[in-house]
A protein has these predicted regions:
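Conserved active-site-adjacent core of cysteine acyl-enzyme catalytic domains
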Residues: 1-132
Length: 134
């Protein structure tokens, strides 16, 4: 993992959670995140669009689907699903039965139970290439 502090980023609009999470990951890795100008969105970003945004910044990212969460992928951007709505958070830590997340909807980092995380997690996550290989 990077030697940088955990970075909390608050999303600017209802549809910016993915971009806020990507920015948090970039800053965690000590990377500059230059978001290109964009029109007002009427929907959120797909994981593929976030993958492409990382690529446009010159950073290699990987998207995975899994039925069980692998703590070796931390830190990573994950997709949650709650009441039919998608939401992105960054997973920054793990301890017995708890997952540490950065939630851009509130702009802070906190712990949730692993049970709650598993219930909400869609099985999708995005990982930036290791800093040493960037």
């Amino acid at each position: 993992m990077g030697g940088y502090p955990l970075i909390s980023v608050k999303q600017q609009s209802f549809f910016d959670c993915g971009v806020a999470c990507l920015k948090s990951l970039f800053l965690y890795h000590g990377l500059f995140f230059n978001l290109p100008r964009r029109k007002k969105r009427l929907r959120g970003y797909s994981l593929y669009e976030l993958f492409k945004l990382a690529d446009q910044q010159g950073i290699q990212a990987f998207v995975y689907r899994s039925s069980s969460f692998d703590v070796d992928c931390i830190p990573c951007l994950v997709q949650l699903s709650h009441m039919g709505l998608g939401h992105y958070v960054v997973v920054y830590g793990y301890r017995v039965n708890q997952i540490q997340i950065m939630d851009p909807s509130v702009g802070r980092i906190y712990w949730i139970s692993e049970t709650k995380f598993q219930r909400l997690w869609s099985g999708l996550f995005l990982v930036l290439a290791d800093k040493n290989s960037l």
